[in-house]
Amino acid sequence: LRAQQQERLQRELDSAISFLEFTRQRTDTVLRASLREQVDVAMQMVQAIHARESQRHPPEVVKRLIIEALRPVRFYQGRGYYFIDDMQGRFILLPTAPQLEGRLLPDNQDDRGHMIMRGLVEAARLPDGQGFSSYRWYLPDKPNEMADKLAYVRYFAPFDWLIGAGDYTAPWEQQQQQAVLERLRAVRFGQSGVITVADHDGRLLMSSGR
C-alpha cells in the first residue's frame, strides 16, 4: 500500500511539474502573439494615413500625422505604447521620453551591455512575423531601474522607419503563474491528497487543501 501511495504521489507531482513547464514555455508564445497583434494594428493605421495623406501633403507633414496618431495609444494596462525609430538609430517617437525624439543614439545600451537600438534595427530587417528583440528598459514606476523586456518591430519602407511595441516579461510571467496556481488549487486525488506550492523562501503560495 505504501508503495502504491508513493507511486500515486509521484504521478501527481510529475503531472503538476509538466503543467508548470508547459505554462512557462507558453508565456513567451502568448506575449509574442500579442505584440505582433498590437504592431500589426499600428501598421494598418500607419499605412492608411500614409496612403491618404501623402497625396496631398509633403512627407514631413505625413510623418508628423503618423507620429501624433500613435503617440497617445496605450495598452497592457498602460505599460504598452508604440515607438518609432529610423534605421540609422534615431528616436522618432518615444512617448515615455519625448525629450529623446530626434536624437541619434545607435549605440544606446541596457544595464547588461546589450545594444538596444542595434538589436531593434536588426530585428526590423527580418521578415514580417520574426522581428523580435529582447533587451532591458527602464521601469515606469522606477525610472532608474531596468527590467527584461521583449519588443516586436516591423519595417515601414516609405520613411525607412521601424515601428514597434514591447512589454516587460515579468507581468506576463506573473499572470501565467496565477493561472497555474488556480489550476493546481482545484486538484484533488485519493481521499485527502492535495498539492502545496511554496516559494524558495518557504512562503506558502497555494494549497489545494484550503
Predicted regions and their residues:
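Extracytoplasmic/periplasmic sensor domains and loops in membrane signaling proteins
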Residues: R56-P72, A97-P140, E173, Q177-R183, ...
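Conserved hydrophobic beta-strand signature of PAS-family and PAS-like sensory domains
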Residues: Y82, R90-I92, I195, G202-L205
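A short beta-strand signature within small-molecule sensing/ligand-binding domains used
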Residues: G80, M117, N144-R154
